[in-house]
Amino acid sequence: FQSIKVVQSFNEEIAEKTAFVRNVEQAFVVARSRVLQRALLTGFAIFLLMGGMVGMMWSGGVDVIEGRMTGGELGAFVFYAIIVGTAFATLSEVWGDLQRAAGAAERLMELLVATSEIPDTGTQTPASNTALAFKGVHFAYPSRPTHPALSDFTLEIAHGESVALVGPSGAGKSTVFELMLRFYDPIAGAIRFGGADLREMSLDRWRQKIALVPQQPSLFSGDIFYNIAYGANEPTQAAVEAAAQMAHAHEFIQTLPEGYQSYLGAQGVRLSGGQRQRIALARAILSDPELLLLDEATSALDTESEWHVQQALTDIMQERTTIIIAHRLSTVINADRIVVMDKGRVIDSGPHDELMTSCKLYQRLARLQFQTEQAS
Protein backbone atom coordinates (compact mmCIF):
# COMPACT_ATOMS: atom_id res chain seq x y z
CA PHE A 1 0.00 0.00 0.00
CA GLN A 2 3.00 2.34 0.06
CA SER A 3 2.29 3.41 -3.56
CA ILE A 4 -1.41 4.14 -3.01
CA LYS A 5 -0.83 7.90 -3.28
CA VAL A 6 0.83 7.46 -6.67
CA VAL A 7 -2.12 5.39 -7.88
CA GLN A 8 -4.59 8.01 -6.70
CA SER A 9 -2.64 10.97 -8.06
CA PHE A 10 -2.57 9.42 -11.56
CA ASN A 11 -6.24 8.40 -11.32
CA GLU A 12 -5.38 4.75 -11.95
CA GLU A 13 -7.74 3.15 -9.44
CA ILE A 14 -9.89 1.50 -12.12
CA ALA A 15 -6.87 0.17 -14.01
CA GLU A 16 -5.36 -1.24 -10.81
CA LYS A 17 -8.70 -2.79 -9.87
CA THR A 18 -8.95 -4.39 -13.31
CA ALA A 19 -5.42 -5.78 -13.04
CA PHE A 20 -6.18 -7.12 -9.56
CA VAL A 21 -9.38 -8.81 -10.73
CA ARG A 22 -7.50 -10.37 -13.67
CA ASN A 23 -4.82 -11.77 -11.36
CA VAL A 24 -7.45 -13.09 -8.94
CA GLU A 25 -9.30 -14.80 -11.80
CA GLN A 26 -6.08 -16.44 -12.97
CA ALA A 27 -5.41 -17.67 -9.44
CA PHE A 28 -9.01 -18.92 -9.23
CA VAL A 29 -8.65 -20.91 -12.47
CA VAL A 30 -5.50 -22.57 -11.14
CA ALA A 31 -7.16 -23.30 -7.77
CA ARG A 32 -10.26 -24.73 -9.47
CA SER A 33 -8.12 -27.02 -11.61
CA ARG A 34 -6.25 -28.19 -8.52
CA VAL A 35 -9.51 -28.85 -6.64
CA LEU A 36 -10.91 -30.77 -9.63
CA GLN A 37 -7.82 -32.97 -9.88
CA ARG A 38 -7.90 -33.60 -6.15
CA ALA A 39 -11.61 -34.45 -6.26
CA LEU A 40 -11.08 -36.91 -9.13
CA LEU A 41 -8.21 -38.57 -7.31
CA THR A 42 -10.21 -38.78 -4.09
CA GLY A 43 -13.28 -40.12 -5.92
CA PHE A 44 -11.20 -42.73 -7.71
CA ALA A 45 -9.69 -43.84 -4.42
CA ILE A 46 -13.12 -44.12 -2.80
CA PHE A 47 -14.44 -46.05 -5.81
CA LEU A 48 -11.61 -48.54 -5.55
CA LEU A 49 -12.18 -48.85 -1.81
CA MET A 50 -15.93 -49.39 -2.08
CA GLY A 51 -15.50 -51.75 -5.03
CA GLY A 52 -13.01 -53.77 -3.06
CA MET A 53 -15.32 -53.82 -0.04
CA VAL A 54 -18.28 -55.04 -2.11
CA GLY A 55 -16.20 -57.75 -3.76
CA MET A 56 -14.75 -58.81 -0.42
CA MET A 57 -18.17 -59.01 1.27
CA TRP A 58 -19.60 -60.97 -1.67
CA SER A 59 -16.77 -63.47 -1.51
CA GLY A 60 -16.95 -63.61 2.30
CA GLY A 61 -20.72 -64.09 2.22
CA VAL A 62 -20.33 -67.06 -0.11
CA ASP A 63 -17.71 -68.55 2.25
CA VAL A 64 -20.04 -68.13 5.25
CA ILE A 65 -22.91 -69.81 3.39
CA GLU A 66 -20.70 -72.72 2.39
CA GLY A 67 -19.32 -73.02 5.95
CA ARG A 68 -15.73 -72.16 5.19
CA MET A 69 -15.79 -69.26 7.72
CA THR A 70 -18.07 -67.91 10.42
CA GLY A 71 -20.05 -64.68 10.33
CA GLY A 72 -17.96 -63.30 13.22
CA GLU A 73 -14.75 -63.83 11.28
CA LEU A 74 -16.23 -62.06 8.27
CA GLY A 75 -17.40 -59.14 10.43
CA ALA A 76 -13.97 -58.77 12.06
CA PHE A 77 -12.26 -58.89 8.69
CA VAL A 78 -14.62 -56.24 7.26
CA PHE A 79 -14.01 -53.99 10.28
CA TYR A 80 -10.24 -54.11 9.94
CA ALA A 81 -10.44 -53.78 6.17
CA ILE A 82 -12.46 -50.56 6.54
CA ILE A 83 -9.80 -49.12 8.87
CA VAL A 84 -6.98 -49.98 6.47
CA GLY A 85 -8.93 -48.84 3.41
CA THR A 86 -9.78 -45.49 4.98
CA ALA A 87 -6.12 -44.94 5.78
CA PHE A 88 -5.18 -45.64 2.16
CA ALA A 89 -7.95 -43.30 0.93
CA THR A 90 -6.43 -40.39 2.82
CA LEU A 91 -3.18 -40.96 0.95
CA SER A 92 -4.68 -39.09 -2.01
CA GLU A 93 -5.05 -35.96 0.11
CA VAL A 94 -1.62 -36.40 1.63
CA TRP A 95 -0.15 -36.82 -1.84
CA GLY A 96 -1.61 -33.47 -2.93
CA ASP A 97 -0.22 -31.76 0.14
CA LEU A 98 3.18 -33.33 -0.48
CA GLN A 99 3.20 -32.05 -4.06
CA ARG A 100 2.53 -28.47 -2.92
CA ALA A 101 5.11 -28.76 -0.15
CA ALA A 102 7.67 -30.15 -2.59
CA GLY A 103 7.28 -27.12 -4.84
CA ALA A 104 7.76 -24.70 -1.96
CA ALA A 105 10.64 -26.73 -0.51
CA GLU A 106 12.40 -26.78 -3.88
CA ARG A 107 12.44 -22.98 -4.00
CA LEU A 108 13.64 -22.80 -0.40
CA MET A 109 16.38 -25.34 -1.02
CA GLU A 110 17.65 -23.29 -3.96
CA LEU A 111 18.10 -20.39 -1.56
CA LEU A 112 19.61 -22.51 1.21
CA VAL A 113 22.23 -24.12 -1.01
CA ALA A 114 23.08 -20.90 -2.85
CA THR A 115 26.58 -19.66 -2.13
CA SER A 116 27.62 -16.03 -1.90
CA GLU A 117 29.43 -14.67 -4.92
CA ILE A 118 31.64 -12.72 -2.51
CA PRO A 119 33.88 -15.27 -0.73
CA ASP A 120 34.28 -14.61 2.99
CA THR A 121 37.61 -16.34 3.38
CA GLY A 122 39.51 -13.50 5.02
CA THR A 123 40.65 -13.87 8.61
CA GLN A 124 42.39 -10.58 9.31
CA THR A 125 40.85 -8.10 11.71
CA PRO A 126 40.67 -4.62 10.14
CA ALA A 127 42.99 -2.07 11.70
CA SER A 128 41.67 1.04 13.41
CA ASN A 129 42.30 4.71 12.69
CA THR A 130 44.09 4.10 9.43
CA ALA A 131 43.98 5.17 5.79
CA LEU A 132 41.81 3.81 2.98
CA ALA A 133 43.29 3.40 -0.50
CA PHE A 134 41.98 2.38 -3.92
CA LYS A 135 44.86 1.08 -6.05
CA GLY A 136 44.22 0.82 -9.79
CA VAL A 137 40.70 -0.56 -9.27
CA HIS A 138 38.90 -1.81 -12.36
CA PHE A 139 35.30 -3.02 -12.14
CA ALA A 140 32.34 -3.76 -14.42
CA TYR A 141 28.93 -4.99 -13.27
CA PRO A 142 28.13 -8.60 -14.25
CA SER A 143 25.10 -7.40 -16.22
CA ARG A 144 27.31 -5.05 -18.28
CA PRO A 145 30.72 -6.69 -18.51
CA THR A 146 31.81 -4.58 -21.49
CA HIS A 147 31.02 -1.25 -19.80
CA PRO A 148 33.51 -0.58 -16.98
CA ALA A 149 32.05 1.32 -14.04
CA LEU A 150 35.53 2.04 -12.65
CA SER A 151 38.70 2.08 -14.71
CA ASP A 152 42.13 2.42 -13.12
CA PHE A 153 40.50 4.15 -10.16
CA THR A 154 43.12 5.31 -7.67
CA LEU A 155 42.35 7.31 -4.53
CA GLU A 156 43.83 7.59 -1.05
CA ILE A 157 41.83 8.85 1.93
CA ALA A 158 43.48 9.65 5.24
CA HIS A 159 41.93 8.74 8.58
CA GLY A 160 39.46 11.40 9.71
CA GLU A 161 39.35 13.08 6.29
CA SER A 162 36.04 14.07 4.68
CA VAL A 163 36.06 13.45 0.94
CA ALA A 164 33.27 14.36 -1.47
CA LEU A 165 32.80 12.49 -4.74
CA VAL A 166 31.24 14.63 -7.47
CA GLY A 167 30.71 14.06 -11.15
CA PRO A 168 28.05 13.48 -13.78
CA SER A 169 25.63 10.56 -13.60
CA GLY A 170 27.35 7.30 -14.43
CA ALA A 171 30.77 8.51 -13.28
CA GLY A 172 31.06 5.58 -10.85
CA LYS A 173 30.42 7.33 -7.54
CA SER A 174 27.91 4.80 -6.20
CA THR A 175 30.10 1.95 -7.44
CA VAL A 176 32.82 3.13 -5.05
CA PHE A 177 30.40 2.51 -2.16
CA GLU A 178 29.34 -0.87 -3.58
CA LEU A 179 32.97 -2.02 -3.62
CA MET A 180 33.73 -0.58 -0.19
CA LEU A 181 30.86 -2.56 1.32
CA ARG A 182 32.03 -5.60 -0.65
CA PHE A 183 28.77 -6.15 -2.44
CA TYR A 184 31.19 -6.77 -5.29
CA ASP A 185 34.95 -7.28 -5.55
CA PRO A 186 37.20 -5.47 -8.04
CA ILE A 187 38.07 -7.26 -11.26
CA ALA A 188 41.58 -5.83 -11.05
CA GLY A 189 43.43 -3.70 -8.53
CA ALA A 190 42.75 -3.65 -4.81
CA ILE A 191 41.09 -1.70 -2.03
CA ARG A 192 43.33 -1.49 1.01
CA PHE A 193 42.62 -0.43 4.56
CA GLY A 194 45.67 0.00 6.72
CA GLY A 195 47.72 -1.60 3.95
CA ALA A 196 45.69 -4.83 3.93
CA ASP A 197 43.47 -5.92 1.04
CA LEU A 198 39.77 -5.97 1.96
CA ARG A 199 39.54 -9.51 0.54
CA GLU A 200 41.95 -10.68 3.25
CA MET A 201 39.74 -9.34 6.04
CA SER A 202 36.76 -10.87 7.79
CA LEU A 203 33.69 -9.59 5.93
CA ASP A 204 31.60 -9.20 9.09
CA ARG A 205 34.29 -7.32 10.97
CA TRP A 206 34.95 -5.04 8.02
CA ARG A 207 31.30 -4.11 7.60
CA GLN A 208 31.05 -3.39 11.32
CA LYS A 209 33.38 -0.46 10.70
CA ILE A 210 31.07 1.10 8.10
CA ALA A 211 27.75 2.91 8.27
CA LEU A 212 25.85 3.81 5.12
CA VAL A 213 23.24 6.56 4.91
CA PRO A 214 21.61 6.13 1.49
CA GLN A 215 19.70 8.68 -0.52
CA GLN A 216 16.48 6.72 0.04
CA PRO A 217 16.81 5.24 3.54
CA SER A 218 15.36 1.79 4.09
CA LEU A 219 13.15 1.65 7.16
CA PHE A 220 11.48 -1.49 8.46
CA SER A 221 7.84 -2.03 9.39
CA GLY A 222 8.54 -1.69 13.09
CA ASP A 223 8.68 1.12 15.60
CA ILE A 224 11.21 3.94 15.75
CA PHE A 225 13.26 2.27 18.49
CA TYR A 226 13.67 -0.88 16.39
CA ASN A 227 14.73 1.09 13.31
CA ILE A 228 17.33 3.18 15.15
CA ALA A 229 18.65 0.21 17.13
CA TYR A 230 18.90 -2.01 14.04
CA GLY A 231 22.36 -3.57 13.87
CA ALA A 232 23.45 -2.33 17.29
CA ASN A 233 24.51 -4.73 20.04
CA GLU A 234 21.86 -4.67 22.78
CA PRO A 235 21.25 -0.89 22.72
CA THR A 236 19.60 0.81 25.67
CA GLN A 237 16.81 3.35 25.54
CA ALA A 238 19.24 6.04 26.64
CA ALA A 239 21.70 5.17 23.85
CA VAL A 240 18.95 5.25 21.22
CA GLU A 241 17.69 8.62 22.46
CA ALA A 242 21.23 10.04 22.50
CA ALA A 243 21.72 8.95 18.87
CA ALA A 244 18.38 10.50 17.93
CA GLN A 245 19.36 13.78 19.58
CA MET A 246 22.62 13.90 17.62
CA ALA A 247 20.64 13.25 14.43
CA HIS A 248 18.18 16.07 15.27
CA ALA A 249 15.40 13.47 15.36
CA HIS A 250 14.53 13.44 19.06
CA GLU A 251 12.38 16.56 18.80
CA PHE A 252 9.92 15.24 16.22
CA ILE A 253 9.92 11.75 17.77
CA GLN A 254 8.71 13.26 21.04
CA THR A 255 5.74 14.82 19.24
CA LEU A 256 4.51 11.42 18.02
CA PRO A 257 1.71 9.82 20.09
CA GLU A 258 3.79 6.81 21.19
CA GLY A 259 7.25 8.37 20.96
CA TYR A 260 9.96 5.82 20.24
CA GLN A 261 7.36 3.03 20.15
CA SER A 262 5.48 4.68 17.26
CA TYR A 263 4.86 2.29 14.37
CA LEU A 264 6.29 3.59 11.09
CA GLY A 265 4.53 1.45 8.49
CA ALA A 266 6.11 0.01 5.36
CA GLN A 267 9.27 1.93 4.42
CA GLY A 268 8.46 4.52 7.08
CA VAL A 269 5.46 5.78 5.12
CA ARG A 270 4.15 7.69 8.15
CA LEU A 271 7.20 9.97 8.23
CA SER A 272 8.32 12.74 5.91
CA GLY A 273 11.44 12.39 3.78
CA GLY A 274 13.49 14.52 6.15
CA GLN A 275 12.31 12.57 9.18
CA ARG A 276 13.17 9.24 7.54
CA GLN A 277 16.62 10.57 6.69
CA ARG A 278 17.23 11.61 10.30
CA ILE A 279 16.15 8.17 11.54
CA ALA A 280 18.73 6.66 9.17
CA LEU A 281 21.35 9.07 10.52
CA ALA A 282 20.50 8.09 14.09
CA ARG A 283 20.97 4.43 13.13
CA ALA A 284 24.39 5.25 11.70
CA ILE A 285 25.38 7.23 14.81
CA LEU A 286 24.38 4.40 17.14
CA SER A 287 26.59 1.94 15.25
CA ASP A 288 29.58 4.28 15.95
CA PRO A 289 31.29 3.63 12.61
CA GLU A 290 34.87 4.44 11.73
CA LEU A 291 33.91 4.96 8.08
CA LEU A 292 30.77 6.94 7.24
CA LEU A 293 29.31 6.70 3.73
CA LEU A 294 26.76 9.36 2.76
CA ASP A 295 25.03 8.71 -0.55
CA GLU A 296 23.41 12.03 -1.50
CA ALA A 297 21.79 12.16 1.93
CA THR A 298 20.16 15.59 1.42
CA SER A 299 19.41 15.65 -2.31
CA ALA A 300 15.66 15.07 -1.99
CA LEU A 301 14.96 17.19 1.09
CA ASP A 302 13.33 20.57 1.52
CA THR A 303 15.30 23.49 2.92
CA GLU A 304 14.31 23.01 6.57
CA SER A 305 14.88 19.26 6.54
CA GLU A 306 18.20 19.75 4.77
CA TRP A 307 19.32 22.19 7.46
CA HIS A 308 18.52 19.69 10.22
CA VAL A 309 20.31 16.88 8.38
CA GLN A 310 23.34 19.07 7.65
CA GLN A 311 23.60 20.02 11.31
CA ALA A 312 23.46 16.35 12.25
CA LEU A 313 26.09 15.47 9.65
CA THR A 314 28.44 18.13 10.98
CA ASP A 315 28.34 16.46 14.40
CA ILE A 316 28.60 12.91 13.05
CA MET A 317 31.58 13.57 10.79
CA GLN A 318 33.85 14.68 13.61
CA GLU A 319 36.91 12.38 13.86
CA ARG A 320 35.45 9.95 11.32
CA THR A 321 36.57 9.15 7.81
CA THR A 322 33.65 10.34 5.70
CA ILE A 323 32.97 9.82 2.02
CA ILE A 324 30.13 11.83 0.54
CA ILE A 325 28.32 11.49 -2.78
CA ALA A 326 26.56 14.70 -3.74
CA HIS A 327 25.11 16.30 -6.85
CA ARG A 328 24.47 19.55 -5.01
CA LEU A 329 27.91 21.09 -4.66
CA SER A 330 26.70 23.48 -1.97
CA THR A 331 26.49 20.54 0.43
CA VAL A 332 30.15 19.53 0.02
CA ILE A 333 31.98 22.84 -0.34
CA ASN A 334 33.29 22.49 3.21
CA ALA A 335 34.63 18.96 2.70
CA ASP A 336 38.36 18.52 3.28
CA ARG A 337 38.73 17.41 -0.32
CA ILE A 338 36.50 17.18 -3.37
CA VAL A 339 37.26 14.40 -5.85
CA VAL A 340 35.94 14.93 -9.38
CA MET A 341 35.08 11.70 -11.22
CA ASP A 342 34.17 11.00 -14.82
CA LYS A 343 33.83 7.67 -16.67
CA GLY A 344 35.11 5.70 -13.68
CA ARG A 345 38.30 7.69 -13.19
CA VAL A 346 39.55 10.44 -10.90
CA ILE A 347 39.83 13.59 -13.03
CA ASP A 348 40.96 16.03 -10.35
CA SER A 349 40.83 16.62 -6.61
CA GLY A 350 41.26 19.47 -4.19
CA PRO A 351 39.26 22.11 -2.30
CA HIS A 352 36.36 23.94 -3.95
CA ASP A 353 38.20 27.18 -4.73
CA GLU A 354 41.10 25.36 -6.34
CA LEU A 355 38.87 23.19 -8.51
CA MET A 356 36.95 26.23 -9.70
CA THR A 357 40.13 27.41 -11.40
CA SER A 358 41.79 24.13 -12.39
CA CYS A 359 39.03 21.65 -13.35
CA LYS A 360 36.78 22.38 -16.34
CA LEU A 361 34.35 19.58 -15.49
CA TYR A 362 33.89 20.90 -11.96
CA GLN A 363 33.43 24.41 -13.33
CA ARG A 364 30.72 23.14 -15.68
CA LEU A 365 28.92 21.25 -12.90
CA ALA A 366 29.06 24.31 -10.63
CA ARG A 367 27.85 26.63 -13.40
CA LEU A 368 24.93 24.36 -14.31
CA GLN A 369 23.92 24.08 -10.68
CA PHE A 370 24.17 27.82 -10.16
CA GLN A 371 21.95 28.44 -13.19
CA THR A 372 19.43 25.86 -11.96
CA GLU A 373 19.28 27.39 -8.49
CA GLN A 374 18.83 30.89 -9.94
CA ALA A 375 16.07 29.68 -12.26
CA SER A 376 14.25 28.13 -9.32
Predicted regions and their residues:
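ABC-type nucleotide-binding domain
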Residues: 127-376
